[in-house]
């Protein structure tokens, strides 16, 4: 119902959205609620954001179909009850599956007085087709770089707008645009929890997203989402005769393959396969995420790839798999043809060089 563009990135949106939930409970003198439920398949930023607002995190396991284990969730809700501030959930989730129990899940949380937070990381799969509010979510953040075509990477600037149901609008950060008769006014609600960024955040990033939405329109947005789902299912089907899929059936905009058997039989890891892809001039997919899938490769072709590009990628995946079986030792050396081969990623993480240093 209402939004703010102040948050400067997706994770910043999570933090800001959780502050919104916290302000709501505080206004009701219900500050005993200090626990957030997060599925074990969640993005790592979810528990990190909850911790930053001094919430304790309760992890709920996934069931064999990749969705939230509804019985485990019921047990947590029965035990914690009035301690629950809310639940954070991505839907479709990080294994690319739309949770069939989503209405039951959000109702369980609402019935004990908690709020439901929608991580918009996978909104690309449902935009124009389904609304988080209709699923029972009270707060949502959007990743403009993931869903609305704003620049991705390069150090920013970014934008992670948050939206909420009408009953939460008075807690939103900063000033809100309110229509009064024939003019608009800027209003700062008394219960607003403060500011998280100057003015309206990285406003030019928001304008780029607006240009994308206005260019595509309702039909174009829906088509982009449909193509993302179609492309993912096409690639999943074509690769399923070679790779082990983490979960069977129709996926949404992405799917996850498990290379655990390849690792066991030939000592070729998901990292080896990803590095080998660089020799073919193709960007490797996300590795080792979600953590609930061992030796995971997450494939998300997106809505922009045509069939020819996907067929080429499928061919490369299969060639690499064949190499892994016939010559596993060389897989540990790849890439062989790049300017820089295997970087010392541990050193880069522990001792990052974040600015130019003259010799």
Question: Residues of each region from the PLM?
Answer:
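Non-catalytic terminal extensions of PLP-dependent enzymes
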Residues: 19, 26, 130, 183-196, ...
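Acidic/polar loop patches that form or flank catalytic/metal-binding clefts of enzymes
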Residues: 2-4, 58, 87, 117-118, ...
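Short, conserved micro-motifs enriched in small and acidic residues
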Residues: 7-12, 151-158, 196-203, 222, ...
């Amino acid at each position: 119902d209402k939004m703010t563009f102040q948050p400067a990135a997706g994770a910043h949106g999570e933090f800001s959205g959780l502050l919104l939930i916290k302000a709501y409970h505080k206004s009701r003198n219900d500050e005993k609620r200090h626990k957030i439920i997060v599925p074990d398949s969640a993005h790592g930023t979810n528990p990190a954001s909850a911790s930053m607002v001094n919430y304790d995190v309760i992890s709920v396991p996934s069931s064999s179909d990749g969705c939230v284990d509804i019985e485990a969730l019921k047990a947590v809700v029965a035990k914690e009850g009035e301690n629950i501030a809310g639940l954070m959930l991505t839907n479709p989730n990080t294994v690319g599956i739309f949770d069939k129990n989503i209405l039951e899940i959000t109702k369980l949380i609402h019935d004990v007085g908690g709020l439901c937070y929608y991580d918009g990381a996978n909104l690309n799969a449902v935009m124009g087709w389904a609304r988080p509010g209709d699923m029972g979510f009270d707060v949502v953040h959007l990743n403009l770089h993931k869903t609305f075509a704003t620049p991705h990477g390069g150090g920013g600037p970014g934008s992670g707008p948050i939206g909420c149901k009408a009953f939460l609008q008075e807690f939103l950060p900063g000033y809100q645009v309110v229509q009064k008769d024939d003019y608009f006014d800027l209003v700062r609600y008394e219960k607003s929890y403060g500011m998280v960024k100057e003015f309206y955040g990285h406003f030019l990033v928001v304008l780029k997203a607006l240009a994308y939405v206005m260019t595509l329109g309702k039909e174009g947005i829906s088509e982009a989402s449909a193509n993302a789902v179609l492309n993912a299912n096409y690639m999943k089907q074509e690769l399923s005769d070679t790779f082990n899929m983490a979960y069977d059936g129709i996926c949404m905009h992405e799917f996850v393959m498990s290379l655990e058997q390849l690792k066991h039989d030939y000592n070729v890891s998901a990292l080896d396969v990803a590095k080998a892809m660089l020799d073919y001039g193709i960007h490797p997919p996300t590795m080792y995420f979600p953590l609930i899938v061992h030796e995971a490769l997450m494939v998300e072709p997106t809505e922009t790839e045509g069939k020819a590009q996907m067929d080429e990628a499928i061919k490369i995946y299969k060639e690499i798999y064949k190499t892994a079986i016939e010559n596993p030792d060389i897989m540990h050396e790849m890439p062989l043809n790049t300017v820089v081969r295997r970087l010392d990623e541990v050193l880069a993480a522990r001792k990052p060089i974040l600015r130019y240093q003259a010799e």
